[in-house]
A protein has these predicted regions:
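Expand to "…catalyze enediolate/carbanion chemistry for C-C bond making/breaking, isomerization
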Residues: 100
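Substrate-binding cleft/loops of secretory-pathway carbohydrate-active enzymes
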Residues: 1-13
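Short aromatic/hydrophobic-glycine micro-motifs
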Residues: 3-4, 47, 377-378
Length: 387
């Protein structure tokens, strides 16, 4: 057995940490500042010393003297891994190259190396990519087939016109030709949207229609796209989401969805490349926002009733399963049109209530997308782009 002398500096021990909040029972730190501190730890030792990395951490559920490392992301974890690995390769012989991760051992200590609801396998994937010197995101995008003819449609329902510019700016990140379809519910809003969109949008073609705000964004989406969906290969649906009972949550949730669907040209290119490379990939949506996960775990009996109603309208011989299942909470996503086309071919105008009525048909449709995808022989993928 070969032995060697060396010391592993287990983070966050012996590092200068910057508190977000510091009380007698609560110590909260920025993971991003830990990132900087470990890189700037230039102390020279007279023996072999290995810098280590760690993940986000939150043991407040089990300890009064808790520590929380907020603002963690798999991308930051990946970047720090890469820098530490580079340091190891520069200073140590191959036989003495060791890379240590403080993964905190237990789920109940709130670490992220194990798969969890917030990041899925994101941290494990980030670790493997850094170890094997792979790019964090695939950058070999070939979208030339989508530029010859406009095969991408974006639909946005604009109820809150103050969010129009935010939507235009996000859609302008699309690196290929796309057509933009916008629905709204009043003539005044339509004129406002026209005046801004025709000036600032990079869309190939723009279509704006007044459609009754019945069923929030859902009925306008289905009605406006019904006659044109067959022209396109891929479709992205957005809407001017707000939450009147919790404005701060609504804004953060909307921003999270927009960023993960259209946040950068690179993100959009990766999504479209995945569709192009995998013929049976039918639907892509962000991991559900972590602050609303508790509302997505259960199916109300009335929602189940509406799900069965939708099945009877579209499919015959299929029985809805009421097991826990994924769905795009917030109803924003990318889709292959062939994977979801049936729902655009039925008339639901008399089945969707006014906003003051029951919302269970709306929740049912939101939960219905992935069932259509699976029945049509496609699969779905959840994205998390670290916003």
């Amino acid at each position: 057995m070969n032995l060697f002398d060396g010391v592993y500096k287990s983070p966050p021990k012996d590092l200068i940490e910057t508190n977000i909040k510091n009380t007698r029972e609560n110590f909260t730190y920025y993971y991003s500042l830990f990132f900087s501190n470990i890189l700037n730890d230039s102390k020279t030792d007279n023996f072999t010393t290995y810098k280590g990395n760690m993940l986000g951490y939150d043991n407040s559920a089990i300890s009064k003297d808790n520590e929380v490392y907020g603002e963690y992301s798999p991308e930051l974890f990946y970047k720090l891994n890469k820098l530490l690995i580079k340091n190891i390769k520069e200073y140590y012989e191959e036989s003495n190259r060791f890379f240590f991760i403080n993964a905190w051992n237990n789920y109940f200590e709130g670490t992220y190396l194990e798969p969890d609801e917030r990041y899925g396998y994101g941290s494990l994937n980030a670790l493997s990519k850094s170890l094997f010197d792979l790019p964090f995101r695939n950058s070999n995008y070939n979208l030339s087939n989508l530029n010859d003819k406009c095969l991408v449609a974006i639909h946005a329902h604009i109820f809150y016109k103050d969010l129009l510019n935010e939507i235009i700016n996000k859609t302008n990140n699309i690196p290929i030709k796309f057509d933009l379809y916008i629905s709204t519910n009043t003539k005044e809003k339509m004129e406002f949207i026209k005046n801004h969109t025709y000036i600032y949008s990079k869309a190939n073609n723009i279509s704006i229609k007044i459609i009754e705000n019945k069923g929030r964004d859902i009925l306008p989406f289905l009605i406006q796209m019904r006659e044109v969906i067959d022209k396109y290969k891929y479709l992205c649906h957005l809407h001017s989401k707000k939450s009147l009972h919790d404005p701060e949550l609504g804004n953060k949730w909307r921003t999270y969805l927009f960023n993960n669907l259209l946040g950068t040209t690179e993100i959009i290119s990766e999504i479209l490349s995945d569709f192009e490379n995998y013929d049976k990939l039918g639907f892509i949506f962000p991991e559900n926002y972590y602050k609303i996960l508790k509302f997505t775990m259960h199916l109300d009996p009335r929602e189940k009733e509406r799900m069965n109603f939708l099945f009877s309208k579209i499919f015959h011989g299929y029985k809805f399963s009421d097991k826990y299942f994924d769905f795009p909470a917030g109803d924003m996503f990318w889709a292959r049109t062939k994977a979801i086309y049936q729902i655009f071919k039925i008339d639901l105008r008399n089945d969707i209530p006014q906003e003051k009525g029951s919302k269970f048909i709306l929740f049912a449709i939101e939960r219905f997308w992935l069932f259509i995808v699976k029945i049509n022989g496609y699969y779905y993928k959840k994205y998390f782009n670290y916003y």
